């Protein structure tokens, strides 16, 4: 609903400031196309992320995403704490 109001508001602004009807049509068409492309990009990004997580052919791929450089300094402390128990 917000997108519809945004498009109508932009159309009103276009009607107010445009020089001719053709310019208004072109501006509205461009705005609608831009919003549609943005929505499609967001949806495709979400679908791509879902596909990677659920249909992962390589089971170790998720472990490659871990930032080992951030974790490695803590490993000795974890081993030391686990060894004291």
From Swiss-Prot:
Antimicrobial peptide with a broad-spectrum antimicrobial activity. Keeps its antibacterial activity under a wide range of salt concentrations that mimic physiological conditions of human blood, which is surprising, since Hydra is an obligate freshwater animal with nearly no salt tolerance. Does not affect red blood cells. The keyword Secreted applies. Residues 1-18 form the signal peptide. It is found in: Secreted; Target cell membrane. GO terms for cellular component: extracellular region. The keyword Protein transport does not apply. Its main location: secreted. Expressed in entodermal epithelium along the body column. This is Arminin 524. It comes from Hydra oligactis. The modification Alanine amide is found at residue 82. Belongs to the arminin family. Keywords: Amidation, Antibiotic, Antimicrobial, Immunity, Innate immunity, Membrane, Secreted, Signal, Target cell membrane, Target membrane. Residues 19-57 form a propeptide.
């Amino acid at each position: 609903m917000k997108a519809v109001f945004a498009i109508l508001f932009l159309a009103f602004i276009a009607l107010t400031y445009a020089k001719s009807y053709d310019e208004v049509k072109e501006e509205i068409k461009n705005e609608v196309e831009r919003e549609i492309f943005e929505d499609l990009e967001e949806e495709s990004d979400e679908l791509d992320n879902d596909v990677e997580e659920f249909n992962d052919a390589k089971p170790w791929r998720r472990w490659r995403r871990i930032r080992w450089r951030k974790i490695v300094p803590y490993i000795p402390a974890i081993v030391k704490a686990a060894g004291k128990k």
